[in-house]
Amino acid sequence: MLKTYITTVPLQGKLDPMLYQRDHVTPPVATCFPIVQVMRDTLEPGDTVQLLAIRQENADTARNYQRLLEELAQLGIAEHQVRQIDLPEDQHPETLIGLCRNLVDALPQVTRVYACITYGSKSIPVVTLTALTCAEATHTELEVGGVYYGEVKRENGQVLSARLYDMAALYQLSGLVGTMRDSRTAEQVFHQLIWMNEHRED
């Protein structure tokens, strides 16, 4: 199966490896990029992989991009399997719409997609989720396998914990809301969402 992963290369000057905990999966391996832990948890023998890396062109992202490539190499993923999606520094609507279009165009027609919305500006999660919604509607057989957020809790500058949350249920909710009609109450939609979340495949 072709599995496509989406992440944003962070702007931070210093990235520290974290052990991102997840429920019901193997113990985590320290990584600077939550998407790498998602890959460890979801890749199976025989899968074909591609990663879409959203990044601005500057010194910090160049350094962090190289670090991402190094971590991917440890998983056996080569640089040619990574496609950069350029992100201009401005946040004008036309720029973000262009980024959304570039993401949709970069997604294969037949694939399972896993997206990480941990890094990037506040607009990136909206752009990513919009691109996934559009691609699900327009692509031949595209399935969203998960939408992840890596949370790091700190106290007095010390890391207390790091967790990886799958936000796919909220993504699915937006799709369900779009199908609501007079015959469906909000309670029915939420019951369906809970059922879908309990019976989804990772």
Regions found by a protein language model. Give the residues of each.
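Detector for conserved single-position "signature" residues within domains
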Residues: 115
